[in-house]
């Protein structure tokens, strides 16, 4: 049930910090979230890709071609891991600088979110209470029907479904009514939050810390990131050349062997 309320809260207050805001957890840094996601994604691709390569090499065609793809895949995975390790400090520095530049704005927005949260919490609590009551009423109405079904035969299945349908529809209608009431209650606070954000951004423009300045600083950081990443990417290119050349030689050898067999026939 708590998940229902939290979901509605997230829909009401969108943003990357919404989950931590409502659960009162210490928010994970933006860079940590990006880094964790990228690590999981890359590892999943690497593992699944290796499985496919292993399956192909174990097949009759793979054995006949003898391309040694698995060896090349492991070499490639090792090279990519080294690149990721080398780029880690560079991207960390970029993200740290960007977070410092926007720290003031984020602090002000966090204060606004906390204030709005205190105002809307009673409405969320009331919604949760009413939802509990509706579910309990539905359970009490359905319980006798379940007992009746257990005591009856299969022919009563349709009869049971006919009795359950209006009860389920009633629960859905009442739930929609409660959600609509909650939406109307929260609407003014949602508008208030949007107005606060607009005011914060307007204050940035008038105070000299304009959005254009933030954009310029972010562009500078991205440019610096690109310059620092160039040598690492060049190392990656050099590391891939032997792998690609080995793969090319294996494929050409397989084609040549196949041609000889065809000519011999």
UniProtKB/Swiss-Prot annotation:
InterPro entries in the record: ApoA_E, Apolipoprotein_A1/A4/E
This protein's UniProt keywords? Cholesterol metabolism, Glycoprotein, HDL, Lipid metabolism, Lipid transport, Lipoprotein, Oxidation, Palmitate, Phosphoprotein, Repeat, Secreted, Signal, Steroid metabolism, Sterol metabolism, Transport
Signal peptide positions on this chain:
1-18
- Molecular function GO labels: cholesterol transfer activity; phosphatidylcholine-sterol O-acyltransferase activator activity; phospholipid binding; protein homodimerization activity
Task: Recount the PTM note.
Answer: Glycosylated. Palmitoylated.
| Tissue expression | Major protein of plasma HDL, also found in chylomicrons.
Primary subcellular site in the record, as a coarse category:
secreted
UniProt cross-references to Pfam families, sorted A to Z = Apolipoprotein (PF01442)
Return one Gene Ontology term, BP aspect: phospholipid efflux
Query: For the modification Methionine sulfoxide, which residues carry it?
Result: 109
Give a yes or no for keyword Amino-acid biosynthesis in this entry.
Answer: no
SUPFAM superfamilies from the UniProt entry = Apolipoprotein A-I (SSF58113)
The record's sequence repeats, renumbered to this chain, cover 67-88, 89-110, 111-121, 122-143, 144-165, 166-187, 188-209, 210-230, 231-241, 242-265
GO cellular component term of the entry, any:
low-density lipoprotein particle
> Subcellular location, in the record's words?
Secreted
Q: What are the boundaries of the region 10 X approximate tandem repeats? A: 67-265
Describe its partners and assembly state.
Homodimer. Interacts with APOA1BP and CLU. Component of a sperm activating protein complex (SPAP), consisting of APOA1, an immunoglobulin heavy chain, an immunoglobulin light chain and albumin. Interacts with NDRG1. Interacts with SCGB3A2. Interacts with NAXE and YJEFN3.
Q: Return the similarity comment.
A: Belongs to the apolipoprotein A1/A4/E family.
Function as written in the Swiss-Prot or TrEMBL entry? Participates in the reverse transport of cholesterol from tissues to the liver for excretion by promoting cholesterol efflux from tissues and by acting as a cofactor for the lecithin cholesterol acyltransferase (LCAT). As part of the SPAP complex, activates spermatozoa motility.
Descriptive protein name:
Apolipoprotein A-I
Species whose genome carries this gene: Bos taurus
Q: Which gene encodes it?
A: APOA1
């Amino acid at each position: 049930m708590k998940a229902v309320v939290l979901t509605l809260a997230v829909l009401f207050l969108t943003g990357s910090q919404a989950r931590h805001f409502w659960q009162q957890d210490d928010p994970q840094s933006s860079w940590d979230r990006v880094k964790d996601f990228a690590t999981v994604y890359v590892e999943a691709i690497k593992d699944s890709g290796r499985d496919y390569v292993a399956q192909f090499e174990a097949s009759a065609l793979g054995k006949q071609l003898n391309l040694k793809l698995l060896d090349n895949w492991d070499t490639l995975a090792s090279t990519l891991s080294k690149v990721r390790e080398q780029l880690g400090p560079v991207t960390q520095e970029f993200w740290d600088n960007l977070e410092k530049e926007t720290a003031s704005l984020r602090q002000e927005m966090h204060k606004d979110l906390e204030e709005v949260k205190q105002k809307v919490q009673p409405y969320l609590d009331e919604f949760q209470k009413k939802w509990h009551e509706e579910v309990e009423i539905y359970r009490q109405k359905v319980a006798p029907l379940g007992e009746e079904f257990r005591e009856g035969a299969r022919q009563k299945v349709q009869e049971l479904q006919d009795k359950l349908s209006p009860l389920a529809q009633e629960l859905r209608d009442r739930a929609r009514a409660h959600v609509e009431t909650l939406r109307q209650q929260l609407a003014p606070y949602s508008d208030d939050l949007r107005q606060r954000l607009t005011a914060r951004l307007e204050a940035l423009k008038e105070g000299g810390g304009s959005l254009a300045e933030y954009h310029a600083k972010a562009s500078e950081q991205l440019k610096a990131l690109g310059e620092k990443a160039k040598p690492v990417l060049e190392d990656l290119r050099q590391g891939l050349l032997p792998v690609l050349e080995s793969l090319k030689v294996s494929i050409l050898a397989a084609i040549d062997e196949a041609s000889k067999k065809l000519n011999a026939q």
